[in-house]
Amino acid sequence: MSLNPQRTYVHHSEDGVATEVPGGEEFWSQPEAEMGRYGEGWLVSEFAFESDWPNWEMHPNADEFAYLLSGSVEVHLERPEGLQRVALKGSGAVVVPRGIWHTAKVAAPSRMLHITRGAGTEQRPA
């Protein structure tokens, strides 16, 4: 069965079971107690961006794989040695190391696929 990863995310549990979960705003507006059940394992999600990310985020428990499907973005990584900018255009990917704050500047409407462990994710305004 086909699914739209912008509207339906996939959660891969520690035991290898993949479960479809409502995506988009429905996912992110869940109460924190509900979100907790997705903290273990890996979340696969797709996002469409027309403007810069409104926040920085950091995943303390695992690296994140961020894959640009289309468009143009510059991913900013706040590394101990200073800000690193990674330009992605058309297609490309970046691995964001665990514990590294990151955001993206959007140069053209873009779609990105993200694979990460959500537990403990922190956010702050951009």
Predicted regions and their residues:
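A short beta-loop-beta micro-motif enriched in histidine and acidic residues
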Residues: 51-65, 81-82
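A short, N-terminal "cap"/entry segment at the start of jelly-roll beta-barrel domains
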Residues: 1-56
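Short, conserved beta-strand element in jelly-roll/cupin
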Residues: 60-75, 115
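Double-stranded beta-helix
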Residues: 1-13, 18-21, 103-126
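Short acidic-glycine-tyrosine-enriched beta hairpin
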Residues: 80-98
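A generic "binding-loop/recognition-motif" signal
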Residues: 61, 100, 108
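Short beta-strand segments in beta-sandwich/barrel cores
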Residues: 54, 71-77, 93-94
